[in-house]
Amino acid sequence: IRHIEEKDQQQLAHVIRSVFEEYGAPLVNTVYDDPRTEHIFDAMAGKNAGYLVVADDGGVQGGCGYYPTEGLPDGYAELVKFYLSPLVRGQGNGSVLFSQAIEGARRAGYSHLYIESFPQFSDAVAMYERHGFRHIPQRLGDSGHTATTIFMVKEL
């Protein structure tokens, strides 16, 4: 597990889109069709943000980060682009990425983390719940991913 590098962007975008296809999640108005998905390293630069990746001999196999999404309340960051290839699931990588992203947001001075998700990612939503994220009735901020239907927040 390491910080994202510019060279990781295309491979990471492929992993993210393949997870949407694998789970049958919506492909429109989501991370899937967002052109920024191919520029995660670029998006993080110069922001109070962070992104970690899981990498092996085959390259980048997933990642997770936090980002000050436009329109969020003061002190909030969004947990962003938390996706893993099936090749690295079930080995504790997701838990480590998730915990490190939460801790990174806390160290960066954020008071809350916000998440948007889908019912198709029920295992991830259950993990968020176990880690103290609570459901809220409506979206916060303007990620542009208007197809999301699950909104959660955690005080840090």
Could you say what each language-model-derived stretch is?
Residues 3-87, 98-100, 104, 139-141, ...:
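Acetyl-CoA-dependent GNAT
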Residues 111-114, 118-156:
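C-terminal "cap" of GNAT-fold acetyltransferases
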